[in-house]
Amino acid sequence: MNTSSRSSEPSKVADDVYVQTRWNNEFKHADYLPESLQKCLDQEKTVLERYSELVEVSKTVANESSQALVKHTTKPGDQLVRRVFQQPHQQISLMERYEKTRSYKPQWHAPWKLSKVINGHTGWVRCVCVDPVDNEWFATGSNDTTIKIWDLAAGKLKITLIGHVMSVRDIAISKRHPYMFSASEDKLVKCWDLERNTAIRDFHGHLSGVHTVDVHPSLDIIATAGRDAVVRLWDIRSRSEIMVLPGHKSPINKVKCLPVDPQIISCSGDATVRLWDIIAGKASKVLTHHSRNIRDLTLHPAEFSFASVSTNDVRSWKLPEGQLLTNFQSQNTGILNTVSINHDNVLLAGGDDGTLCFYDYKTGHKYQSMMTTEVAGSLESERSILCSTFDVTGTRLITGEGDKSIKIWKQVPDATEDTFPGLPWNPTLISQRF
């Protein structure tokens, strides 16, 4: 019995060394993990833990080959193997997380500067929207109850549309029809024929002021919302209300439509963002990460994601599940009224105090912060950014402001990373991409 027991020990050691050698030879030159191993890693890593234990056992084996193998596994090319077979309780430390976050290098973006100031409205400029087809003109709505259409290149007024009797809060232009829709505090949503420059339809149904409107990109419907805290869907042709989506507890500030689920996204003063399932007629997801009034949200023009802003808080979200992507470096930015994103991953957040904050969308890094230019004769209290949008190319930024002006901003053409390094990249553990 004793002889048999002693004879089995060398066999077990040999098996252990053989298994270890196989694993090291398999992965010592690997730069990534096979999908099957990654799944094991995500499912408690039972097989991999066994291997990790074998590595530890081999350290105690008093023979030449096993000692050489242990030394071999400390080579740089094999560090991936040891990292894979960590025990589940070996979590990354806060300092390691911080250093990892700092190691990300944000994309460099050229700085922005004021290019043009346009005057014409006699009240706050509450909304702005660019022609999505030809990118040749843009429309603005104001507290003076009018909608004005401007030439984008020259900044000249083309026409003034009159029809609302109270402040115009939002504008949406259809890509599929020659129509523009406007939402107003007078409880009406109007459809404007851009070929005849007249209002051709009114949509009645909201119980109080309408704050936002958007056109569905593939269906003949529009979504509206406002002070009555419900989202309403309308048939464009018949003007009939086809669905009401209740759920928010406070006035809704912005609604956006998508061609795929979730087809409706809304944000509200109740500090929530809701993703709506219009087939079921209810919210499929409620995002509660913000703590204050969410004043605006916008879709990324190329990615399937969106961003939202509230006081001292800018966040981006992945669609369709609504997963939090990034906390932006937005501390001490104050009340934020508007957010816009271009194709180059530049995010603008416009503040109630007239601050324009420019961020790298991928990392949340604030690379430029500047104050808007005061218009002669305006009060300091009127220096607020109320709305914004990039043009179709993303090279021009248009802002509507509390001093009744419209401003067009462009990037500095000859800027380089050496001449404008931007604000320092000093992320915190709060500001990171998840």
Curated annotation (Swiss-Prot):
Superkingdom field: Eukaryota
| Single biological process term from Gene Ontology | mRNA splicing, via spliceosome
Q: What is its main location?
A: cytoplasm
| Cell compartment(s), UniProt | Cytoplasm; Nucleus
In terms of Pfam families, this protein maps to: WD40 (PF00400)
So what family is this one in? Belongs to the WD repeat PRL1/PRL2 family.
* Subunit relationships: Associated with the spliceosome.
Q: What does this protein do?
A: Involved in pre-mRNA splicing and required for cell cycle progression at G2/M.
Its recorded name reads Pre-mRNA-splicing factor PRP46
